[in-house]
Amino acid sequence: MKQLILALMLLLIGGGIGMTQAQTTGKKVDKKTEKAAKKAAEEAELNAKYALAVKALEQQEFVLEATRVEFKRGRSEYVSSTTNFVSLKDGKATVQLATNSVISGPNGMGGITVEGNASHIESKTDKKGNITYEFQVQGTGISARVSFRMTKGTNRCRATVYPNFNSNMISFDGELYPYAQSNVFKGRTL
């Protein structure tokens, strides 16, 4: 009798564990499919942003909204994307830097805004699909070469400004958008 009760208890416990494992396996499958669907949606969104950025580069009407700025000797600072940007529209290039400082600066926002005519515009795509986009800027307060580097599959971009008369290069890291979709505030230019 005791053996029969013990066998029934083991059978009930074993059956319960088996059902729990089946439910756990079902949850794992659901989580895996959910994770895969989420990853596919994120990848599709990034590819759509990349396609818009490539089209904006081809039309020469774009804005790089920077969230991080890196100075000559590697010092970097996180900044606002609405006040730190590099843009090109109608043959005019604008470079604006506005750090989070107390001093207002020449542009009224804690930095400097320079504008000039863009020339010698070149675009190259390497075998991996990464894009390098360069142009020269000449204007009041700026004489420089600007080089953009955008990785395939994303609109994340890095623009480096190389001045012609000194070595105080500066890099802007952020996302590249078509000019019409950008959300930037332009300060006073020099």
Predicted ranges, named:
Residues 18-58, 63:
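Sec-dependent signal peptide cleavage junction
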Residues 1-28:
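Bacterial Sec-dependent N-terminal signal peptides
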Residues 77-130, 135-136:
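Mid-length scaffold segments of soluble, non-membrane domains
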Residues 67-69, 89-91, 98-100, 138, ...:
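Solvent-exposed coil/turn segments that connect beta secondary-structure elements
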Residues 30, 120-190:
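Helix-rich interaction surfaces within compact, conserved domain-sized segments
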Residues 56-67, 183-189:
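Surface-exposed, interaction-prone regions used to assemble/regulate multi-protein complexes
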Residues 48-50, 66-81:
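N-terminal post-signal-peptidase region of extra-cytosolic proteins
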